[in-house]
């Protein structure tokens, strides 16, 4: 495999380890000085790798599920990945009470890879759909 394929495989493994709840794998896959340009809106997260671990612990408890890699493109040290995240809103997420309902959202993430580790992240999530599924925004009414 070439560097681009290795980088894409690294990102796929990252999501597989998230799905498995393997927090220890983050030490291998993510640089200590990891920079998240779009961190989750959770107050009090530490910077870097430690903040990423904190966020995953919170989301694993509240919204267990899986990530499906739909598409990937790699160029130089960047990997763009489109994912579909499916799960269940199982436990309260901060002040948002759990609905116990299904979650199904898409996101696009771009990672920069350096020396076999994720070093930077930029992302866009379908936040509107996510907020509807979390019960924060009312879902649209069905046909009349």
What are these regions (language model features)?
Residues 1-144:
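C-terminal and inter-domain tail/linker signature
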